[in-house]
Amino acid sequence: MHHVYVIECSDGTYYTGYTTDVQRRVAEHNAGDGAKYTRGRTPVTLRHTESFDSKSEAMRREYRIKQLSRAQKEALF
């Protein structure tokens, strides 16, 4: 399974990413081993996930979510 996730950073911003293991990836973000964007913004909280059968579907959805406004992202959860 391939997943797209949205996490909320400690400063209130949102980060959207792709992974095959959501819990592991959130733990990596919280440990400071995630994306450069989240390293100074821990702890992070998981807000939204979507699952897909293919990596390409998940990556397309990740791109679409990243294009959304903050209000549109909040409407997801």
Swiss-Prot record:
Domain of life the protein comes from: Archaea
Organism: Halobacterium salinarum (strain ATCC 700922 / JCM 11081 / NRC-1)
Protein name stated in the entry: UPF0213 protein VNG_2274C
Domain GIY-YIG: 1-75
PANTHER family recorded: UPF0213 PROTEIN YHBQ
InterPro entries referenced in this protein's UniProt entry, alphabetically: GIY-YIG_endonuc, GIY-YIG_endonuc_sf, UPF0213_domain
Annotated CDD domains: GIY-YIG_UPF0213
Family from the record: Belongs to the UPF0213 family.
